[in-house]
Amino acid sequence: MTRLLRHFLVFASCALGISMASAQMRAQMRVLVDQVGYETKAPKVGLISAAPTDHPAQFTLIEDETGKVVFTGAPQAEGKVDRWGDRVYWKADFSSFQTPGHYILRIADGDTSALSCAFQIDDNLLERKTLSNVIFYFKGQRASGALDRADSHLKLPDGPGAVDVHGGWYDATGDYGIHFSQLNLTSYFNNQQVPLVAWTLLAGYDTLKARNDDNFSEYERRMLDEGLFGADFLVRMKRPQGSFFQSIDGPGVKKLPQDRKIGDLNWKLTVKTKADQLNEKEPPAEGPHSHEVSFRSGGGVAIAALALASTMPEDGDFPRARYLQAAEEAFAFLQAHNRELLNDHAENILDDYCALLAATELYGATHKQSYLLAADQRADSLMARLTTRDAFRDYWRADNGTRPFFHPSDAGLPVVSLVRYATVASAANRKKTLDAVKRSLEFELATTREVNNPFGYARQLVRMGNGDVRTAFFFPHDTEAAPWWQGENARIASLAAAARMAAPLYGDDPSFQSALQNYAEDQLHWILGRNPFDSSMLIGSGHGNIPYMFFRSYKYTSAPGAVINGITAGLNDEDGIAYNEGFAQTGKDDDWRWAEEWLPHAAWYLYAVSLPHR
């Protein structure tokens, strides 16, 4: 086969996947791979999506440049995934092949064959091929122009005067607001947004620096610059004698500069049926600190980011001492007043892990014993939430009862905060922490393996709207956040980060270490195209990127380096699967659930990819 013909067939195969990504599953045999590629020494598995009548007998790994067959194997049957349609999956395992290069997988079933998209095998592949784009994405999301100028003199929400809060990053493809967090009224689903971006950039900078690879040097320079840009914004959002403003809203159909304002905490989503509809709001928050964040609504991670920024090798627009001052003042305020800022006035697991990260970073920046004591207390509170009930052993308890913690974007943050804490804890507390982390991650691994799951997608323990507790692939549609639900690429990337952070700590258990590395890689493979829809969800990488449409308009276009929301449960089946079933199918503004880019997805992806791995 000539290279030109081979490339035409590969292109046609991928283009077919692009055009049909919203179909439930294709009838023809498909070869699903990580469309960027695989680490040289890591497991390398392609998945074959086949009809029940298909019985692929052989797979071959073909060198893209020459057409030479370099590896041959027999696919292993993996079976169906319950309620994901009638597709049967087969595994093509070529893990033992470790020669860097560009390759294609070919699957044969009698006279029928199928080709994968081309992919690469190399060391530090995702760092090399994707990290730069993600950093550029954040720079492209910086507030600028007329909107940024408006943000430099926004009216104070609770009195006369104006405040300069320019800077920050626009939240999503179609949202030019700038948010610390959202979903306040849900109690359990506050997501970490702009502060998370700042923290992951700076923590990722430290991580890459510690890996001591000159190939990363320019990434480090740009991550430091971007992280300090975020820290500068957090300083501007800091309220004197208080916490931080939570949000800058960019409301209105035309998103005009003059409409921008400090955001109300009590935001509620409306699923629109017309483009000119606006989101609903509950009665506005009231009180002297009504527009300020709690630990769980962005304050804890903002403090962590500012404390970490104060340890960087250079200043941003503000000196490093100012970063630390803002962090210490906000921490002192929230230690005294956090419950007053909560919608239900009751702390839960989100407050624990956000405050733990804040205290840990403050101790790292200052070595003040008061911060280590605060971190010890929050770590103890968090670890006490490991709970066993019925068949569910060592899950995180979200409240003071038995409600499981599950989260659409930050599921890995309890472990991330504990592993970060373990670096400063006493020997006794470190031992206790590593035991808790292992128990938690063993639960995650067991839940993921509980059912047939050839993709290794991170499953979760959830609480349905009727109170039933069960395991599931995807975030339920009937939680306190309803009608808000969307794809979970941030969730699985946060779990990949948690697993990669934890893995080096368990050198005495190679099997557990390997399981964590596999688990992390499986989540990244899913994002990069090894999923049932053959769609890379990192814009500009791989194939099958789906466009974000707003009522049939493409005016909001996702940026290269962005990670979109991703795959969800079925529209009418919590155990089903759906992707890109928007306005054209539902008659509602549902496209964002799958196709919209969002800061937390890229933030967690960047951090996971920055971490050392095998």
Predicted regions and their residues:
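Aromatic (Trp/Tyr) and acidic
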Residues: Q35-D111, K139-P195, G204, G250-A309, ...
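Long, well-ordered core segments of solenoidal/helical folds
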Residues: D122-A150, E226-G242, L324-L342, L373-D394, ...
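Transcriptional activation interfaces
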Residues: W199, A203-Y205, K209, S217-P257, ...
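Short Trp-Ser/Thr-centered turn/loop motifs at beta-strand boundaries
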Residues: G110-F119
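Boundary at the C-terminal end of the N-terminal hydrophobic targeting segment
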Residues: A21-A23, A27
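Short coil/linker segments at helix-helix boundaries
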Residues: A203-F229, P283-S290, L308-A326
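Bacterial N-terminal signal peptides
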Residues: H7-S19
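N-terminal secretory signal peptides that target proteins for export/translocation
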Residues: M1-L5
